[in-house]
Amino acid sequence: ALAICAGASRPEVRSVAAFAPPADFEDWSNDPEHLLGHARSVGVIRDPDFPKDFDAWAEELDHVKAIDSAAEFAPRSLTILHGGDDDVVPVFDSRMVADAHGAADLRIIQGAGHLLRYDPRAIAVLLGWVDRQRFSHNV
């Protein structure tokens, strides 16, 4: 979700691939302490002093909306991968983000959960996407 939001605000970003993006962070923004604890437990946030200003950080969660950013990111290339058995972010969220973009390549990896970075099928799809981006942009 963050990559989609960042890409939408940066015109030099030509393409984005995202794993299981939530359409928005509304559920998390209702309980930011839980999000912070979860992010620390899975190693996403490792700095014990983060965030410096918890209230400001928690307020920013209301503005993280991949569904809105996907529409802004179009017509640039967006690929979304989602595990068919994801129990953290519903597959429906990725479908909504893809629909908001209008031309996103949505790949549902059957039998995969939320941790797609450990699924060789998802990594193979991602590497194929990277190759296509390289060659389509002559990088």
Feature-to-residue mapping (PLM):
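Hydrolase active-site cap/lid region
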Residues: 5-57
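Acidic beta-to-alpha connecting loop that harbors the catalytic carboxylate
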Residues: 84-86, 110-113
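Short beta-strand/loop motif that positions the catalytic acidic residue
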Residues: 73-74, 79-82, 86
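Alpha/beta-hydrolase-fold serine-hydrolase catalytic core, especially in secreted/extracellular enzymes
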Residues: 120, 132-139
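Conserved alpha/beta-hydrolase "acid-adjacent" motif
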Residues: 87-93, 117-118
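Catalytic histidine-centered segment of alpha/beta-hydrolase-like enzymes
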Residues: 112-123
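Hydrophobic residues on the short alpha-helix immediately C-terminal to a glycine-rich phosphate/catalytic loop
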Residues: 2, 6-7, 21, 97, ...
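Active-site nucleophile elbow and catalytic-triad environment of alpha/beta-hydrolase enzymes
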Residues: 52-70
